[in-house]
Amino acid sequence: MMSPQEQLERIKFGTADFINDEDMLKKLKRSIETKKPLNIKLGADPTRPDIHLGHTVVINKLKTFQDLGHKVSFLIGDFTAMIGDPSGKNSTRPMLTREEIEENGRSYAKQIFKILDPEKTEIVYNSSWIMKMTPAEFITMTSKYTVAQLLEREDFTKRYRSGTPIGIHEFIYPLTQGYDSVALKTDVELGGTDQKFNLLVGRAMQAAYGMEAQCVLTMPILEGIDGVNKMSKSLDNYISVVDTPKDMFGKTMRISDELMYRWYELLTDVGAAGLNQLRADVAEGRKHPRTVKVELAKFLIKRFHSQAEAQAAEDEFNRIFVEKGLPDEVPDFEVEAETQMGLAALMVKAQLAASNSEAGRLIQGGGVQIDGEKVSDPRLKIDLKSGASFVLKAGKKKFVKIVVK
């Protein structure tokens, strides 16, 4: 068994904020002495049906606690989702319907078990205690925090000073999230850096109810495949945990070498020593960056799919890109799903040819390939089914990855 100090070092690896060492060591020592695991909580509002790698950063840290033998609760904020988290927002968020929340919650629960051990994970819903509160109990909860304290939040302050409306329900959001920690008797709560204020409210709410305050741990925001912006579906720089192995592999191979190390730190269990060793191996020529990136891609696919699919994705990537001499970085071109589209028309649409006749000549001349295989029929029809993707090459230097939405 790891000592309290060893556990603390592993827990803190890769974190953005940790509050605080002294409290955590006390909790860990008591846990070992009493043989009672700590209560660890991560909450998420089911505001969208699927999660991407950026969301998994904090789930990976939850898995660390699970591996250390602590009790893990994944809280689905079905009540708070109806309010809408105002964190980082400059306007009031629209509230979701109960049906949307329930469907998204089921999807979340299924996806987190690609990382967490389902036998050691408790799924809880905050409506199960908040909806049972009497009006008097709810008012008592709101009395534990002041408007002045809530206005310490930067986004609330900006909106207040600019005259932008703030709904009363938005003030209630951090209070109800904080009360979740009271209900679950949480020892440690995890979240992204954008959740720090809400997590600290939970710490304060526990103290107000006469409980030992939870420790707070936040994880950094993960950069998307562009290496610049936060991973986001709206910026189309994300990898979803439900992406195909082929897409996961291809997208991972497009990231920069420096971002590769960042992803190793936040998305794998390599640890501090392992990460330092990887950097040294590349710097001293023992490993090529491309090899290290392949290992990362295979790790991700193994986690969200299987070892066999990880190997198959590498083999397919090598067949298309390495053996055929295609570059690792091929730009995406999105097209709407259709029953079929002529190859020549698709080439024009993707700006690989100026006209159908030019595309036809390229095809007949053997200058067009789909996933590394030559095509010769200028009248060929391509099935464009949603979710499909393939690399289209025209001539010697024009490449595009067709992604069907």
Curated annotation (Swiss-Prot):
A cellular-component GO term for this protein: cytosol
Keyword line: Aminoacyl-tRNA synthetase, ATP-binding, Cytoplasm, Ligase, Nucleotide-binding, Protein biosynthesis, RNA-binding
Top enzyme category: ligase
Catalytic activity from the UniProt record: tRNA(Tyr) + L-tyrosine + ATP = L-tyrosyl-tRNA(Tyr) + AMP + diphosphate + H(+)
Pfam families documented for this protein: SYY_C-terminal, tRNA-synt_1b
Annotated motif 'KMSKS' region, positions: 230-234
SUPFAM superfamilies linked: Alpha-L RNA-binding motif (SSF55174), Nucleotidylyl transferase (SSF52374)
Residues involved in ATP binding: K233
The keyword ATP-binding is annotated on this UniProt entry: yes
CDD domains: S4 (cd00165), TyrRS_core (cd00805)
PANTHER family, A to Z: TYROSINE--TRNA LIGASE (PTHR11766:SF1), TYROSYL-TRNA SYNTHETASE (PTHR11766)
NCBIfam families per record: tyrS
Protein name, as recorded: Tyrosine--tRNA ligase
